[in-house]
């Protein structure tokens, strides 16, 4: 019998998805996730709880279950949350996620805050920023760059037409 010896971090995201089994496979393919453990309803195959590690981060997820108040972004019509995932190379990470089925919303771009960032939507309605640092930028310099960007009419999002 195995025991639960995992040291939980102070905060872990808990994602609700439609078809958790497919989501688990997507996160493995897109982000190199490793599965810690899974609780499955033997009668339906539904995932009641699974824990994954993604690049050193602990993520939990479960199948949508409206009876428990768990609805996925697909059922809600979107999400107000975006996850920031630090990666070795944003270009490679975005390509890998796209190959696994993600939609690239913003291609890898050098950003004013000193990161190269890409924005993706996964097939389950969750949004992710894949990024790596390309330069050290002080808070003061970041504010100057932000002000200049806004003054120029730039939205800061290369995929935006606004």
Model-derived regions: residue spans:
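Vicinal oxygen chelate
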Residues: 1-14, 24-25, 31-121, 132-162
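Short acidic-aromatic low-complexity motifs
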Residues: 17-21
């Amino acid at each position: 019998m195995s025991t639960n010896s995992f040291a939980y971090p102070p905060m872990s995201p808990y994602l609700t998805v439609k078809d958790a089994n497919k989501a688990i496979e997507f996160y493995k393919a897109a982000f190199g996730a490793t599965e810690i453990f899974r609780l499955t309803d033997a009668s339906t195959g539904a995932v009641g709880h699974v824990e994954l590690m993604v690049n050193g981060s602990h993520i939990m997820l479960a199948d949508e279950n409206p009876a428990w108040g768990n609805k996925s972004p697909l059922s809600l019509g979107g999400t107000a949350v975006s996850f920031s995932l630090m990666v070795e190379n944003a270009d490679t990470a975005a390509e890998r996620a796209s190959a696994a089925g993600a939609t690239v919303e913003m291609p890898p771009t050098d950003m004013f805050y000193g990161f190269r960032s890409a924005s993706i939507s996964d097939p389950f309605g969750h949004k992710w920023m894949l990024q790596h640092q390309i330069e050290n930028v002080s808070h003061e310099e970041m504010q100057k760059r932000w002000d200049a960007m806004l003054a120029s009419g730039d939205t800061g999002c290369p995929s935006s037409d606004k």
